[in-house]
Curated annotation (Swiss-Prot):
The chain crosses the membrane at residues 33-53, 77-98, 113-133, 178-198, 226-246, 288-308, 320-340, 347-367. Its cofactor is heme b. GO terms for molecular function: metal ion binding; ubiquinol-cytochrome-c reductase activity. It is found in: Mitochondrion inner membrane. Heme b b562 binds at H83, H182. GO terms for biological process: mitochondrial electron transport, ubiquinol to cytochrome c. It comes from Marmota himalayana (Himalayan marmot). A ubiquinone binds at H201. This is Cytochrome b. It holds the Pfam family Cytochrom_B_C. Heme 1 (or BL or b562) is low-potential and absorbs at about 562 nm, and heme 2 (or BH or b566) is high-potential and absorbs at about 566 nm. Heme b b566 binds at H97, H196. The lineage of its organism: Eukaryota, Metazoa, Chordata, Craniata, Vertebrata. It comes from the Eukaryota. Keywords: Electron transport, Heme, Iron, Membrane, Metal-binding, Mitochondrion, Mitochondrion inner membrane, Respiratory chain, Transmembrane, Transmembrane helix, Transport, Ubiquinone.
Length: 379
C-alpha cells in the first residue's frame, strides 16, 4: 500500500512543505522565527475572532464594549491581553526575522524577500488599525495624527484624508471601516505568508554560511519540527508571563481614558514597535519630507538585494560588515527610545543624527564596507 502522506493531493502538499522538505543541516535558532510568526498570526486570528464577537465598532459604545469584554466576558481579560501583547510578540519576531535576513543575506531570494517586505507593511497597517479600535485617547489621537500625514501628498492629500475618514474628522465612519479592515487583513496576511513560503520552497532555505547546501540536506521532520516546538514553548512562556504579570507594560496609560476630541494628550505616540519610524518622521521639519522618510524607512528593505556588493552572501565571515550591522541595530534601538521621548532638546538632535545614520549605513556604509572586504580578500 502506498503511503497516504505521499499520494493524497492535500496531505502531499503538507508533506512537501513541512515533513519531507529537504533542509540545510546547519540552520541555527535564527531560522525559528518563521514558524513563530505563523504561530503569532494564528494566536492573533483566534483571539481577535473571540474579541470581535463582543466588540462594537461605534464611537459611543466601543470603549464600553472593551471594558465589558474585560469585566463580564468569561476570560475576556485574558483574550484581550493575549491579543494586545501577542501583537508585541509578533513584532519582536518580525524584527528578528528581518534582521536575520539582512545578516545572512537571505534577501538574495528576490521574490521571497519582496513578499516579506509587503507582509511587514501589511502587518504594520493591521496593527495600526487595531490600536484605534479600543477608542481610548491614544487610539483617537494616534489615528488623527497618522491619517493626517496623507494630507502632505500634493493636490490630492486633503481629499484623500477626508475620504479615509469618511467625514471631516476621525469619527464613527473611520472606526467602522478600520474595524472592517482590521478583521480582513490578517486573512490576507495568511494568504501572503503562503506565497512567501511558496517562493522560499522554490529555492530552498538559506543557511548561516551563505553557501549552497544541496549536498548536505536533512528532512524537516523530525529534526526541525522538534526545534520549532522548543521555540513555540519559549514564545508562549514569554507571552503568558507578560500577559499574566504585567499586561500593560507595553501599552499606554492614556488609552484607559475614553477618546475625547476636545482634549489632546501631552505626548501623542504610537505603540513601541512603530517608535523607530515615528522618530524618523519627527526628525524632519518638513511635513512631506517626514512622510517620505517614514515610508522609505521601511521600503529601503527592498533595496538590499541591489545594494549587496559583497562577493560573499552571508556576513558570517565578514567582520567589518558585522560591526556595521550591529551599529545599525544599536541605531534602531536609539530611534525607538527617541520616538517615545518629548520633542525637545536634546532628543530632537539625537533623533536627527540617528535618522541620518540609519539611511547612511544602509545606502552608503554597508556597500562601501562590502567592497573593502572584497579587496581585502583579493576577490
Amino acid at each position: 500500500m502506498t503511503n497516504i502522506r505521499k499520494t493524497h493531493p492535500l496531505i502531499k502538499m503538507i508533506n512537501h512543505s513541512f515533513i519531507d522538505l529537504p533542509t540545510p543541516s546547519n540552520i541555527s535558532t535564527w531560522w525559528n522565527f518563521g514558524s513563530l510568526l505563523g504561530l503569532c498570526l494564528a494566536i492573533q486570528i483566534l483571539t481577535g475572532l473571540f474579541l470581535a464577537m463582543h466588540y462594537t465598532s461605534d464611537t459611543i459604545t466601543a470603549f464600553s464594549s472593551v471594558t465589558h469584554i474585560c469585566r463580564d466576558v468569561n476570560y475576556g481579560w485574558l483574550i484581550r491581553y493575549i491579543h494586545a501583547n501577542g501583537a508585541s510578540m509578533f513584532f519582536i519576531c518580525l524584527f528578528l526575522h528581518v534582521g536575520r535576513g539582512v545578516y545572512y543575506g537571505s534577501y538574495t531570494y528576490f521574490e521571497t524577500w519582496n513578499i516579506g517586505v509587503i507582509l511587514l507593511l501589511t502587518v504594520m497597517a493591521t496593527a495600526f488599525m487595531g490600536y484605534v479600535l479600543p477608542w481610548g485617547q491614544m487610539s483617537f489621537w494616534g489615528a488623527t495624527v497618522i491619517t493626517n500625514l496623507l494630507s502632505a501628498i500634493p493636490y490630492i492629500g486633503t481629499t484623500l484624508v477626508e475620504w479615509i475618514w469618511g467625514g471631516f474628522s476621525v469619527d464613527k465612519a473611520t472606526l467602522t471601516r478600520f474595524f472592517a479592515f482590521h478583521f480582513i487583513l490578517p486573512f490576507i496576511i495568511a494568504a501572503l505568508a503562503m506565497v512567501h513560503l511558496l517562493f522560499l520552497h522554490e529555492t530552498g532555505s538559506n543557511n548561516p554560511s551563505g553557501l549552497i547546501s544541496d549536498s548536505d540536506k536533512i528532512p524537516f521532520h523530525p529534526y526541525y519540527t522538534i526545534k520549532d516546538i522548543l521555540g513555540v514553548l519559549l514564545l508562549i512562556s514569554i507571552l503568558m508571563i507578560l500577559v499574566l504579570f504585567s499586561p500593560d507594560l507595553l501599552g499606554d496609560p492614556d488609552n484607559y481614558t475614553p477618546a475625547n476630541p476636545l482634549s489632546t494628550p501631552p505626548h501623542i505616540k504610537p505603540e513601541w514597535y512603530f517608535l523607530f519610524a515615528y522618530a524618523i518622521l519627527r526628525s524632519i521639519p518638513n511635513k512631506l519630507g517626514g512622510v517620505l522618510a517614514l515610508v522609505f524607512s521601511i521600503l529601503i528593505l527592498m533595496l538590499f538585494p541591489l545594494l549587496h556588493l559583497s562577493k560573499q552572501r552571508s556576513m558570517m565571515f565578514r567582520p567589518l560588515s558585522q560591526c556595521v550591522f550591529w551599529i545599525l541595530v544599536a541605531d534602531l534601538i536609539t530611534l525607538t527610545w527617541i520616538g517615545g521621548q518629548p520633542v525637545e532638546y536634546p532628543y530632537i538632535i539625537i533623533g536627527q543624527l540617528a535618522s541620518i545614520l540609519y539611511f547612511t549605513i544602509i545606502l552608503l556604509i554597508l556597500p562601501i564596507i562590502s567592497l573593502i572586504e572584497n579587496k581585502l580578500l583579493k576577490w
